[in-house]
Amino acid sequence: LRVSAAVALCLPASCVALAVATVALSEKSKPVEPPAPKVCGVVSGVMYEFSSEYVPFWPEYEDEGSYKRGSGGVDRGCESNLYSLSLAMNWPELTPGNYFSETFSGIVVTLEPWAAGERGLRETFDFFVSEATYKQREASVFDRQLGLNRVEGVDSVFPNSPRMIFWSERNGHMEQIGRCSWSKYRSKYHRCHFRYLLEDSKAIVKIDFGWDELSEWGEIASRVKIFLASNGIQG
């Protein structure tokens, strides 16, 4: 009644402002609907479905313009083609991780369609290794623990920040590539970004994890493959 009386007694200009404020307060008091319990979509012909607890960002869909991707707010069916979907997981449990927590130290898995196939993966590797000089490339070594080739390069933008580059090939076929970045603040390597193609080479898996988990990369890659397969339905 007090709000109604105030509206009745106010001047025209102030009435508008008061009415808007009243509506805003009433809208704010409405309960926020919880997100859908599942996030689903199709990547390269395979339908995937995950608990929304894994998904820290809005999924991006192929039929959205680049300026709309990841903006969310649209209810999508599971038949919609995904452009990119990221999952935050605790390691080694692979349970949903709280990506926005300051204590989050898990892995982030991104699944995307990949029309470029092995050629595209090799081109990305060429870009990574271009940060190493010819002399550094000649000094590359095979890391037996990881089962990967390794070479140290330098960030092209920040010369004082080294980069560790990893890759593996089989019969001339690029299987996986990775790069770990140096943290000047911590004075050590900090985060790693690896990627590999799924068996049909039509989808790519990108995994970000901490430097301290590098020795477990083989297990990370293997278990993530199993996790994705268990949540995918072949179309």
Give a label for each model feature:
Residues 190-206:
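Extended hydrophobic
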Residues 37-43, 166, 194-198:
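Short acidic-hydrophobic surface loop/beta-edge motif
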